[in-house]
A protein has these predicted regions:
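Left-handed beta-helix
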Residues: 4, 9-10, 15-16, 21-22, ...
Length: 74
C-alpha cells in the first residue's frame, strides 16, 4: 500500500507533464505545463506559475504571487 506524501487541494490546476516531488503542499494555485516542484515546497492559494518553471526544494511561494514562464526559484 502506497501512502501519498503530497497534499494537493482539490482546487489546484495542474498543467501537462508537471513533476511534483514528495512532501509538497499545494493550495488553490495554478501550475503551468512541464513545471517541476521540488521536495518540501509550499505554494499558497492564488499563485500562478508559468510553463517550464523549476521550484527548488524548501521554497515557499506566498499567496497571490505570479511567476512567469521559464523561471527558476531556488
Amino acid at each position: 500500500m502506497s501512502k501519498s506524501l503530497k497534499r494537493i487541494a482539490p482546487d489546484v490546476i495542474l498543467g501537462k507533464d508537471v513533476i511534483i516531488f514528495d512532501f509538497v503542499n499545494l493550495y488553490g494555485c495554478k501550475i503551468g505545463d512541464e513545471t517541476r516542484i521540488g521536495t518540501f515546497v509550499e505554494i499558497q492559494k492564488g499563485v500562478s506559475i508559468g510553463k517550464r518553471c523549476k521550484i527548488q526544494s524548501h521554497s515557499f511561494i506566498c499567496e497571490g504571487v505570479t511567476i512567469e514562464d521559464e523561471v527558476m526559484v531556488a
